[in-house]
Amino acid sequence: AVGLHYLDHGQMPYADEYGNLTGGTFTAKDILIQLMYARQLGQTFSIGVALKPILSFYESYSSVALGMDIGGHYHTPDSSLHLGLALRNVGWQLKGFYDEYGFQHREMLPLNLELGINYRLKHAPLRFGMTIHNLQRWDLSYPTASQDLGGQVKWYDMLFRHTIFSLDIIPKSERFYLTLSYNHRRRAEMQLADQRSLAGFALGGGVRIYKLRLGFAFSQLTKSSYVYQASLSFDIQSMLK
């Protein structure tokens, strides 16, 4: 299968290191292409791999990276319970954003080991899901310019920062779906103490038209920052039949 993800951050104003606007705007865009292959091993288990060329264009800077996702999936015979384990972003930059000491500055992609579980009700079009991400490291806090967050996050807060909860509405025909998710880490990091926002929440949906799958998602990072995502994917093998 082939997938395409395009993320446009929109027009952003130029500013100095103190946040003072200096005039003019610039754009930032990311393009991710997925080349996916999956193989069924028995009736309830499958494995898959996805190769991901990543192109980034930020103002006058650009980067090219190559990543790979590897995963396995199990479901019960009645398909009500699904379990998945995935290692994401195995790869590195082929071209960095800038030069350092006369050489390209290249970085590894942010590795992410994830475990997912979801359960679909038998007599209602509802599916509940939970994803536990970044299993390879416990401490997801980071220092800022004004304070060091290391050690200040309670253990139960850190535990929930590793989790993403979701609720899907999927009719029996499965020709479309709606989904709502909550990411506690995103809310903890992006929510401002004196402002209300939907940071951490995301709403999306999708539709299947012939052999194409179209998806759309909306999320709010801060009170004035919104992210709109659209995706298009199709199965090459089914298209050739």
For each predicted feature, which ranges?
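Subset of outer-membrane beta-barrel
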Residues: 1-241
